Amino acid sequence: MTGKQGVALSESLNPAEKTSLVINGGSLQPKISATNPPPRCTGFGIQEILGLNKEPATAPRSPLSALPAGAHLIAARSVLGPAGVGVGMGLIGPAGIPSFYSQPAFLETVLADGHDVRLQPHNRSARPLDANQSVSSDSEDLSSSERKLSKSSVNQSKKRKKRRHRTIFTSYQLEELEKAFNEAHYPDVYAREMLAMKTELPEDRIQVWFQNRRAKWRKREKCWGRSTVMAEYGLYGAMVRHSIPLPESILKSAKDGIMESCAPWLLVQDGLPINRRYSKSEYPQLFAGMHKKSMEAANLPATAKCDAPQQPSAQRSEDVEAEEKRSDGKSTISKEEMRENSIAALRAKAQEHSAKVLGTVSPGKLLEGKQEKQAVGEKVSEPPSPTEEQKSP
């Protein structure tokens, strides 16, 4: 654009500035007064050309060219000082500033913006500083929260009761503890101290062992039986092996009815159905099994109960009794006869051994030794005569 249109555009862009036109050979050239700075173009966009992004008018200032050589650094220090970055730049001499920052255009923009506007490099450097400060504050908050959590967890762990390691007893310690338990289930303080000295265990461990041992003993010993036989074999095994009577609770329930009893399988005879309803007249037949045996054992006196397992039962057959008598007759050989037979057998074995090793024994003597062996075997196998039985005590 040239001529009047260019002048009009320049006037519209900078109405506050007064320009004078000088004609040099038919061409118009604007002459700028020394008091106003030359117009600066911020950009070539539509908004910049139309003046939509026009900056507010500033006070007139002297051109940079009128300033002396050292005034550029002073002006820069005065502007950059309040922003917080002029301290570092003030220490640098005029020759130390880069050529780009020492140009009048840079200082001109600084002077034009004034103290309120911060430099763009300063803003760019200040934002990371703020971000670093925020990150550091966040990290401090996290570290403080982690410390609080760690302290709370430590306090909780201290509050919780530490789990004690399980005590492993040696065989000697268990033997001593069992001996003391057989003597007294509730040992006094003196007994516990003596056990602690013997077993080298703390007294509280001994007390806990006795508590556990008493609980185990109560579990084994039934409250209605109170016998080690009941604990070993249970109800069925104790009744079969040792003829222990049934508990009173089962007997009372059997009087009301077998099906209503606690253990009908112990009352009903083998081979009879349990689900069937029985009348009271049929109860004796049902009680002919294990219940009958338990009732007989309950009716016997105390002295007879001790001897009952040793006495032969009346239900044994005659063949079994005969076999027992024969075995008893064979076992009635006197001790002297058994001793003589064993001595003779040892002598015969010694002679055979010497004959084989030394070869000094004649074959006739070997035959005699064999005959003696056979005679001893016949004596042991033959049952004793009735006269010998009478002689023997």
UniProtKB/Swiss-Prot annotation:
Q: Does the keyword DNA-binding apply?
A: yes
Where is the short sequence motif Nuclear localization signal located? Answer: 147-151
Offer one Pfam family short name for this entry.
OAR
Which residue ranges hold the DNA-binding region? 162-221
Query: InterPro entries from the entry?
Result: CVC (IPR023339), HD (IPR001356), Homeobox_CS (IPR017970), Homeodomain-like_sf (IPR009057), OAR_dom (IPR003654), VSX_homeobox_regulators (IPR052294)
- Region of interest: Disordered: 121-165, 304-393
Q: Which UniProt keywords apply?
A: Activator, Developmental protein, DNA-binding, Homeobox, Nucleus, Repressor, Sensory transduction, Transcription, Transcription regulation, Vision
Q: Report the residue ranges that make up the CVC domain in this protein.
A: 222-296
Give the location in the cell: Nucleus
Motif (OAR) positions are 341-354
Query: What main location does UniProt list?
Result: nucleus
Where in this protein would one find the motif Octapeptide motif, according to its record?
44-51
List the GO biological process terms: regulation of DNA-templated transcription; visual perception
GO molecular function terms attached to this record: DNA-binding transcription factor activity, RNA polymerase II-specific; transcription cis-regulatory region binding
Stored PANTHER family: VISUAL SYSTEM HOMEOBOX 2
Q: So what family is this one in?
A: Belongs to the paired homeobox family.
Q: What does this protein do?
A: Acts as a transcriptional regulator. Mediates the differentiation of V2a interneurons. Plays a role in eye development and organization of the neuroretina.
UniProt-recorded name of the protein: Visual system homeobox 2
